[in-house]
Amino acid sequence: MPTSVFPKFHSSLSTQAKRLVAMRFLIYTGFQTSYFIGVIGTLTYADGASVVATSLAVLFMNVFVILGSFAGGAELDAWGPRRHFLLSIIGALATGTAIIAFGSATGVVLLGAVFLGFTMGFAQPIATSYPAYLTDDPVELKDINSAIAMFSNVSIIVGPMLGGFVAAAASSRAVFVLMMLSTVLAFVVGWGFRPQTSHVAGDADADSAEEGERAGRSSNPSTSARATFAASIKTVFTNSVLALLFCIIFLSNFGYGAFDPLESFFYRDVLRVGVGWMGWLSSASGVGAVLGAVVALRLPPHLVNLKTLLVALMSVGLGSLLYVGTPYVGVALVGQIALGIAWGVVNPLHNTIVQTTAPLEQLGRVNSVMGFGNMFAGVAPLAIAPWLAATFGVQRTLVGAGMVVTAVPAALLLFGRRHLDRAAKQ
């Protein structure tokens, strides 16, 4: 990373913003040690399960990530970040304990995927919504979101790498111990987190952090109480920016849903590498994503828009084609880095656009609605992924999925210019 970037980025953050970045980094590192290796890796390598089993695991994960995100968004809007964070910690520790205790049979791993998915979804607002509790300044929000994205992507390096070594030395299920250790560290760091709510409610009692959180959610508590999910859905689809963003993410991620259930078989049968490589190649994606977050940090404010997001999403597709296009692990490594760079730009852009558009008192649930579109796009291809893999082969199916991921944002850029210009004006 260029030496001129990090000091500027580091000094621009408040103390609470730095604490938030650390909270997200630690809890997300725990999730990254466990999902791909602990669930998909156990099914593929330890159990010798079929594509159907891994597809079911991803289906369960995605469905319960959606349900968890709705529950987490509602909890955040009702009680604020501190209680939401505590419940996220409890959920992660309980999930890790249960998976370790009950063994690695296929049915148990699938049930573990349910609990892990719900916990990961519940914790999503830490990255997507908490920054808006610290500031409402768009430039500062972009910096915080870029910082969160950067260190979340460091998690994608550190988590799978540690998980890969643990899986190679012990077993794929042992990675859940790492998840629990990382979660405990996140709790320690997050103990001093205090939302800064003066930009929302100037009369908040400075001597009461709990009152500050409640004031931060809305200057009118009765209004906050009446803000239901139906209102949040209406907020998304009556706002041209949010509605278009929902459609962009849904359509762009539709092809990407085929990757999760098939990637482990791509490693085993096409690249012909062991389970440890699942972690190490994921870490390569994290290296790229850190670089992408640096790019996002340096974007001028006028480029924080939907057109830039579409270009980044198209780059995701191109990177995925390089990743799965050959049987050579070296090429896959380069593809993962390219893919990571693109995702490193996408995530902070997406979160900043949502946070500067949605009302704070509904932000948790608005992000849940946006997350639903993202995750449902990943669920839909699971119904046909096993058939496609059996008919065309794993690698050809993944290449086809990469082509879809590339083509959708390209088409939206070419043919949706009028809608993009209208959203930009708003």
Where on the chain are the PLM-derived regions?
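Juxtamembrane intracellular "pre-TM" segments in multi-pass secondary transporters
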Residues: 1-17, 196-246
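Cytoplasmic membrane-interface "Motif A"-like loop-to-helix N-cap segments
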Residues: 78-89, 300-313
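Helix-loop junctions at membrane interfaces in 12-TM secondary transporters
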Residues: 101-113, 324-335
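Helix-loop boundary and gating motifs at the non-cytosolic
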Residues: 2-63, 239-283
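Transmembrane alpha-helix termini and helix-breaking/packing motifs in multi-pass membrane transporters
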Residues: 38-46, 158-179, 269-270, 380-398
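Substrate-agnostic recognition of the 12-TM MFS/MFS-like secondary transporter fold
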Residues: 19-36, 61-74, 80-89, 108, ...
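Helix-loop junctions on the cytosolic side of multi-pass membrane transporters
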Residues: 182-207, 414-425
